[in-house]
Each structure stands twice: as structure tokens, then as C-alpha cells.
């Protein structure tokens, strides 16, 4: 067997194979014997079918099986011998398989880039300056009031306003023709929530229970359903019920409803404490992102599309999961799967490059994660999620991939700490961050 390797790029290799005719003939015989054991052809006993009859009835299967067996036997051996570590499935391109002739095929794969990280001393980055903001406490209290609010039917004759919940029937059409997803009964919508097509909710404001009206809107050009994007639509709407939100009064009794507080002042202090913690975490995460981007600017290299696609799919699923918790979809955001991927592909590529560089830095600086550090992190996870440590340990013991991911994250964190220790960090106001 002859093997040659072509480097199509820094992250793509093509492995060329030439299999001797004798090997092909041997594999054909093996496949023939295997098929003959099970072949059921009228007029012949199982296992006694002549070779020419087998070839006539099972020609395509024989060719497929021979190709599969040869590729499986030779491809993986070549990866080991040539020290190639693919991150993608191979794309196989082959000649026609002919008995008595050498067989040629190629396998093209993406590979992990060989990166030597450089210029990571003295990276210059900006960090957002933490600022205390009393308005946050007021806003959070308002959110808590909203969450504790209950809905009451509006008085007869009262017009709907922003913030009210309206239950209505609607039927949509484009040029008089109904379209999929354009109709519903007893649909409830909070006016001002932005869940509907731009302009739709605004036209419900001022309507009263029992009112019927025609609403005209234009679907956004980037709407998720491409067949509707940019088109004018008409909706007939009938208001069935209007409900208004009744907010609880902000006082000590309100605070006591949340269990651990005796006074409203205690609740405010806790809100401020949690906010400050979250703000600092956000600022540190932003600093981390800026540090990684600064490192990427110093280290130019290609990344396999397979890794970017994998990261994009992960981001998409996470976004869908978060939106689902709010009873939303990416289509409601004016996107579909392909639109999302196009919009966030650059961000996914940055994340992949960052992970590769941090891994390279960890190797170069001999950064390792100890068992004690893993145990400490598991304790933090248990505390943060109010879980029993024994259960957390058991989960990671039974999920090798989860534990490997945890160790990899800890190693990345230590690499970031090293970068920070060598970086020049300047604190600035938020508005100065991107100047």
C-alpha cells in the first residue's frame, strides 16, 4: 500500500492511498464468502450460490462492502502512522473499484492547528470601572413587583394601554391569502412586550373589549420565515378580554414575602449586594473576553470550519434554551437557524481561537490542574447550586466527559490568570471601553 499526504492548508490534509490489486482481490473474496453465507436466491441452497450469481444479484452491495472494508482498514492505520489527528469526518473520493487493478482513493480531513503562542507578555487591555448605581435597586424592586403582580379584568369600556394583557383572536393574510402561523384564538399578549411583528402591538393600544379591527403591518426584511420577509400583511383582530396588572405595595410586608427579610430596607441591601456581585462578575468576564481578543490579534492562524460549526451549534442550542424559558423563539427575534449562524459566526470563531490559544499557552507554560483544584471547584459547584457535595462528586465520577470539560475550564482559567499577571490593564468608564 502506498500513502502520501498533502497539506491543503494549515488545517486541512488530503491523504492519498493506492491499494495493490492483490489486496483488492483478497477483499472481494472475503466479501463474497460473507454474502454467500446469508444470500437467499431462489433455486439455490443457502451457502451454495455460485460466485457469478452472487455478483449478478449483489454487485452494488459487494462493491460498497469492499470499499468500506478497505477504507476502514487503511484510513485509521494511516492516521496513526502519519500522526494525523482529525477534527472532522473524512471526505472520501475514490476511483471505480476494479478487480485486477490497483485501487486509489483519498481522504480529506480537517486537523487541529499547530499553534505556537507568542507575544503574550504585556497585552494592553481596558477594564470597565465598577460604579455603584442606586437606580438598579429601584429597577429590581419594580421587576419583583411585576413578578408578584396579579391580573384583574379591566372595567367595561376601558381602552387597552401598554402593560395591559390582551386576549384576542386574529387571522392574518397576505394579498387576501391566509398563511401558516397567521391565525390563533384566545391569544394573550402583554402590550409593549415586543413579542409581535413591529407595529402590531401599537395598533392594539386604545382598543376595548369586544372591539374588532383590521391591523396592517409589514414583516421585517430579516424575518425568520423567508417567504414572509418584507411582505405587507393584514390581520383581522377581535379583542375578547383586557386585564390590567395590579402591583403590590412596596413596604415591609412586601419584603417579608421573600422569606429572609424583615424590612424593605433589608431587601434593598440584599438587592444591592447581589447586583454588585453580578456586576463584578460581568466586568471580569468582559475583561477576559478583551484579553483573549488581544491575544488573538497577536497570533494569526486558521481554524477548522468543523470546530467553528460545532461551537455555532452549541451557541444556537443555548440561545434557544434561554429563549424557551421566556416562552420565546429565535423566529420571534426575526431570525432562523441559518440567520443566527450567519450573525454569530464571527463570535464562534473568536471563541474557538481563544480556546486553542489558551490551550497552547497552558502547554507552553506547563500549566496543570491538580486533583485538589478540581475538588475545590466541585465544592464551589455544590455550594452555588445548593447541592450535596457527595451527589456532585458522584455525577462527575460517572460522567468522564463532564469532568474532562471541568478540568479544561480550570486550565483555561489559570492561563487567563497568567495573561492578566503579565498584562497592562487600564480601568475606564463604560463609555470609554471601545474608544
From Swiss-Prot:
Residue span, PPIase FKBP-type domain: 163-248
Name of this protein: Trigger factor
Major place of residence: cytoplasm
PROSITE patterns per record: FKBP_PPIASE (PS50059)
Pfam families with a match to the protein in the record: FKBP_C, Trigger_C, Trigger_N
One GO MF term: ribosome binding
Enzyme's top EC category: isomerase
Domain notes: Consists of 3 domains; the N-terminus binds the ribosome, the middle domain has PPIase activity, while the C-terminus has intrinsic chaperone activity on its own.
UniProt-listed GO biological process terms: 'de novo' cotranslational protein folding; cell division; chaperone-mediated protein folding; protein transport; protein unfolding
Family per record: Belongs to the FKBP-type PPIase family. Tig subfamily.
Function: Involved in protein export. Acts as a chaperone by maintaining the newly synthesized protein in an open conformation. Functions as a peptidyl-prolyl cis-trans isomerase.
GO cellular component entries: cytoplasm
Keywords: Cell cycle, Cell division, Chaperone, Cytoplasm, Isomerase, Rotamase
Enzyme Commission designation: 5.2.1.8
Coiled coil: none
Intracellular or extracellular location(s): Cytoplasm
Catalytic activity entry: [protein]-peptidylproline (omega=180) = [protein]-peptidylproline (omega=0)
Amino acid at each position: 500500500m502506498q500513502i502520501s499526504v498533502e497539506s491543503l492548508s494549515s488545517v486541512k490534509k488530503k491523504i492519498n492511498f493506492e491499494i495493490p490489486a492483490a489486496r483488492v482481490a483478497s477483499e472481494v473474496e472475503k466479501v463474497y464468502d460473507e454474502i454467500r453465507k446469508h444470500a437467499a436466491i431462489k433455486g439455490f441452497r443457502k451457502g451454495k450460490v455460485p460466485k457469478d450469481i452472487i455478483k449478478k444479484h449483489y454487485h452494488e452491495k459487494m462493491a460498497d462492502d469492499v470499499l468500506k472494508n478497505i477504507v476502514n482498514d487503511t484510513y485509521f492505520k494511516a492516521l496513526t502512522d502519519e500522526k494525523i489527528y482529525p477534527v472532522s469526518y473524512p471526505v472520501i473520493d475514490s476511483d471505480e473499484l476494479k478487480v485486477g487493478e490497483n485501487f486509489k482513493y483519498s481522504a480529506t480531513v480537517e486537523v487541529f492547528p499547530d499553534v505556537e503562542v507568542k507575544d503574550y507578555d504585556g497585552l494592553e487591555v481596558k477594564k470597565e470601572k465598577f460604579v455603584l448605581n442606586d437606580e438598579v435597586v429601584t429597577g429590581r424592586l419594580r421587576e419583583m413587583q411585576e413578578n408578584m403582580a396579579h391580573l384583574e379584568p379591566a372595567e367595561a369600556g376601558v381602552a387597552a394601554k401598554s402593560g395591559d394583557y390582551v386576549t384576542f383572536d386574529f387571522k392574518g393574510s397576505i394579498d387576501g391569502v391566509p398563511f401558516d402561523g397567521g391565525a390563533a384564538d384566545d391569544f394573550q399578549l402583554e402590550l409593549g412586550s415586543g413579542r409581535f411583528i413591529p407595529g402590531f402591538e401599537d395598533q392594539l393600544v386604545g382598543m376595548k373589549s369586544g372591539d374588532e379591527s383590521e391591523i396592517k403591518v409589514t414583516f421585517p426584511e430579516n424575518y425568520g420565515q423567508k417567504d414572509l420577509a418584507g411582505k405587507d400583511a393584514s390581520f383581522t383582530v377581535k379583542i375578547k378580554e383586557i386585564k390590567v396588572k395590579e402591583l403590590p405595595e412596596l413596604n415591609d410586608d412586601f419584603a417579608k414575602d421573600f422569606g429572609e427579610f424583615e424590612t424593605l430596607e433589608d431587601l434593598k441591601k440584599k438587592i444591592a449586594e447581589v447586583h454588585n456581585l453580578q456586576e463584578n462578575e460581568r466586568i471580569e468576564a468582559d475583561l477576559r473576553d478583551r484579553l483573549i481578543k488581544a491575544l488573538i490579534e497577536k497570533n494569526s492562524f486558521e481554524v477548522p470550519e468543523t470546530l467553528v460549526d460545532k461551537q455555532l451549534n452549541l451557541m444556537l442550542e443555548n440561545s434557544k434554551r434561554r429563549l424557551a424559558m421566556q416562552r420565546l423563539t429565535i423566529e420571534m427575534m426575526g431570525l432562523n437557524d441559518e440567520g443566527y449562524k450567519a450573525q454569530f459566526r464571527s463570535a464562534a470563531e473568536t471563541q474557538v481561537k481563544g480556546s486553542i490559544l489558551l490551550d497552547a499557552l497552558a502547554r507552553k507554560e506547563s500549566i496543570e490542574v491538580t486533583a485538589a483544584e478540581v475538588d475545590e471547584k466541585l465544592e464551589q459547584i455544590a455550594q452555588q447550586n445548593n447541592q450535596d457535595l457527595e451527589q456532585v462528586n458522584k455525577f462527575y465520577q460517572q460522567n468522564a466527559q463532564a469532568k474532562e470539560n471541568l478540568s479544561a475550564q480550570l486550565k483555561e482559567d489559570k492561563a487567563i490568570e497568567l495573561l492578566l499577571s503579565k498584562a497592562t490593564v487600564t480601568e475606564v468608564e463604560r463609555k470609554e471601553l471601545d474608544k
